[in-house]
């Protein structure tokens, strides 16, 4: 009996001592705190992971709610009304405006009959500031009035310009006189290569046959002078002379030795009359 009581007392004391040593040992206390910390860290990690997943889900939901802008088609050609004269032809419908009416009638697919409006059919013609329609100008012609009346004259016909001549005397113009055409003579004098007229050998100018007393083979008047038998081809006062016709050389004189025979009126030189003129 005594031995059993002693054994129980010994066992109780040994258990008490062992418990006290475990609590007082720092190593054992560290193991216990480490186990507690691990459990705490694992729980916190799980919480962080859970919170992260919840945040990602919220961001995804927000992105899905963002509206994406869609480009809107804009027409490239915007129709603009243009005001112009009544004879304007439209580029799309080839609309033509007549002079008798003031309405543009389209000849395309949108054209309709008179008095009926259709899509693109009738467009009002441009008007003035007071509301009146713009008048269509009447057709004009550049033909002279004499051609229209079948009565044509030389003065109303167009003339062809004559090219400038390279040779000749001191003439007032280069090729021809006051008229249009070119004379076949000319060595100097009043004009360079022509007459005072407008035809081949003079014309309707100052004389009929020749120049104005200054060309090589020309003179002042016609080929018919005052004195018929006295003129010759080198000058004189006669048929081919100066006052009436001046001859084919100078202004006056006679024969080869006249005052202007091959003389001062032209470019060949002058002399003094040695012969008496025959009457």
From Swiss-Prot:
Residues listed as glycosylation sites in the UniProt record: 37, 217
Alphabetical UniProt keywords: Glycoprotein, Host cell membrane, Host membrane, Membrane, Secreted, Signal, Virulence
Subcellular location: Secreted; Host cell membrane
Segments carrying motif RxLR-dEER: 29-46
Start and end residues of each stretch annotated as Disordered: 29-53, 135-176
GO cellular component terms attached to this protein's record: extracellular region; host cell plasma membrane; membrane
Organism superkingdom: Eukaryota
Signal sequence, start to end: 1-19
Sequence ranges of Low complexity compositional bias: 135-146
Biased composition (Gly residues): 166-176
Polar residues compositional bias, start-end: 147-163
Family the entry assigns: Belongs to the RxLR effector family.
Role, per record: Secreted effector that completely suppresses the host cell death induced by cell death-inducing proteins.
Protein name in UniProt: Secreted RxLR effector protein 90
